[in-house]
Amino acid sequence: MAKQLSTARKFKMITGKDLFQQQKAMDTELKKEDGEITDLMEFVQYGLYLALFQDNIVKAKSDFSDFRSSFEFDTDGKGLKELVELWQKEI
């Protein structure tokens, strides 16, 4: 089997943020009564989608950059829960 980058490493290369730290931040925000969770959830959802399904890191970074300015993204109908479950199979 050929060597490959982990999903967490690809996520960091694409978004500039650590996936585990982003997951912790999401958990923290969910516990707050007035937590701001939408931006964080979309950040993780789209970053994780790109890390899992876009093999071209340069294109993934470009797509993520576009998302950061427009807040529009397409995950082919895959929700955050499904993406996290796919990633957790790797851990």
From Swiss-Prot:
Induction: Expressed in the late phase of the viral replicative cycle. InterPro entries: Gp12, Gp12_sf. It comes from the Viruses. The keyword Cytoplasm does not apply. Keywords: Late protein, Viral release from host cell, Viral tail assembly. Coiled coil: none annotated. The keyword Lipid biosynthesis does not apply. One of its GO terms (biological process) is viral tail assembly. Homohexamer. Further self-assembles as a spiral. Belongs to the skunalikevirus chaperone protein gp12 family. Probable chaperone for the tape measure protein. Might help to maintain the tape measure protein in solution during tail assembly. This is Chaperone protein gp12. It comes from Lactococcus phage p2.
